[in-house]
Amino acid sequence: MVSSEQMKNIEKKMFSMGMPVEALKEKVGIGISSWILDRQGLIENGAIVLVGPGHNGGDGLVVARELYMAGVDISIWCPFPLKKELTQKHFDYAIRIGIETLEHKPDSNSNSLWIEALFGLGQSRIISDEIVHLLNTKKKSSPDKLISIDVPAGLDSDNGNTVSNISSKASSTLCLGLFKTCLLYTSPSPRDA
């Protein structure tokens, strides 16, 4: 178990030893997509990746690409402007190869798998009521069809508290690298907006 600061220090050491960020992102995306592909029932109605502005969003875009290449009906939705150059490159490539980009928020009552890649480790951003409501509605309508990458949106990765008393409360969280301290705590109760 590691805190966000410990995980960031581990990553800094890896990068200082020559590990390319791009290679790590590929490893993460391939691992997550393999986990999902091993559970075909999750993707029988397709999947939507909710892409955040930073590196977590980039991880989600690699997952989207790998699932698309495996023949999964996949779409991406970006509710925020992308802020990281590498994430933008993965987004541009996803568009070039034909992955559908949703212009409007996805239907939370659909039976498609949602892969939440909005914020991840060290999140401090307050999530809008609209996003919270969307994630909570998805969790209620399809309890097993909401997966978070690394740390669920709205959850403080160090103490398990919710950022502004909200959290996506994913059915599964696929941790990257090492388990995060927040997972020791009881699952948070999200506020439904």
Labelled PLM ranges:
Residues 59-60, 124-127, 156-160, 183-184:
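Short glycine-/acidic-enriched loop or helix-start segments at secondary-structure transitions
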Residues 1-40:
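Positively charged, low-complexity intrinsically disordered leader regions
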Residues 185-193:
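Single conserved hydrophobic/aromatic residue that forms the stacking wall/gate
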Residues 147-163:
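Conserved beta-alpha-beta core of the PfkB/ribokinase-like small-molecule kinase fold
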Residues 158-184:
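Short, glycine-/small-residue-rich phosphate/pyrophosphate-handling segment
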Residues 34-117, 128-148:
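Nucleotide and nucleotide-moiety/phosphate-recognizing core
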